[in-house]
């Protein structure tokens, strides 16, 4: 399950591990996104949203307590929880970060990062949830921090020290 810590600026921060998710208005972070993708679904009107650490493109269709692990179930659980908190699907927007190609020197590269990105884009398009910003691909891992109360700001810190905001 996700863990809550107090950040250096004394704000509560929820740490989202692989296959985990959280929704609400608290700052959320996901550390060590390689081929995994940090999926943010944000409701700017209500200043709430969710972050999921998506590892694989598709679930087997079986119920799973780690719904955040798969693109299809992560989108579903974030939308479900946000609408239960009063969001309208028509107000939701998405941001994606991660999907790196971490093992490019191996033959038969599975392109998991690319497949994760394609799956999330297709699902969000089908649900008419626009992707307003993305930072995908490359060969360097990322850590993302999502600030729901700050217009859905998403800060991305790459393993090489580069930081940017989307």
Swiss-Prot record:
GO terms for biological process: chemotaxis. Gene3D superfamilies: 3.30.1330.200. Keywords: Chemotaxis, Hydrolase. It catalyses: L-glutaminyl-[protein] + H2O = L-glutamyl-[protein] + NH4(+). InterPro entries: CheD-like_sf, Chemorcpt_Glu_NH3ase_CheD, Cytotoxic_necrot_fac-like_cat. Disulfide bonds: none annotated. One of its GO terms (molecular function) is protein-glutamine glutaminase activity. Its EC number is 3.5.1.44. SUPFAM superfamilies: CNF1/YfiH-like putative cysteine hydrolases (SSF64438). It is an enzyme of class 3 (hydrolase). The keyword Hydrolase applies. The keyword Oxidoreductase does not apply. Probably deamidates glutamine residues to glutamate on methyl-accepting chemotaxis receptors (MCPs), playing an important role in chemotaxis. Belongs to the CheD family. This is Probable chemoreceptor glutamine deamidase CheD. It comes from Methanospirillum hungatei JF-1 (strain ATCC 27890 / DSM 864 / NBRC 100397 / JF-1).
């Amino acid at each position: 399950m996700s863990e809550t810590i107090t950040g250096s600026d004394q704000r509560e921060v929820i740490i989202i591990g692989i296959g985990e998710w959280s929704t609400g208005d608290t700052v959320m972070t996901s550390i060590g996104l390689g081929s995994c993708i940090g999926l943010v679904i944000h409701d700017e009107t209500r200043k709430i949203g969710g972050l999921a650490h998506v590892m694989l493109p598709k679930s087997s269709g079986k119920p799973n307590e780690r719904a955040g692990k798969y693109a299809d179930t992560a989108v579903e659980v974030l939308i479900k929880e946000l609408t239960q908190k009063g969001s309208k699907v028509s107000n939701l927007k998405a941001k994606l970060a991660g999907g790196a190609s971490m093992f490019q020197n191996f033959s038969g590269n599975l392109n998991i990062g690319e497949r994760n990105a394609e799956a999330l884009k297709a699902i969000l398009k089908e649900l008419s949830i626009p992707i307003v910003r993305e930072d995908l691909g490359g060969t360097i891992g990322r850590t993302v921090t999502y600030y729901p109360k700050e217009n859905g700001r998403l800060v991305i810190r790459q393993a090489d020290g580069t930081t940017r905001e989307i």
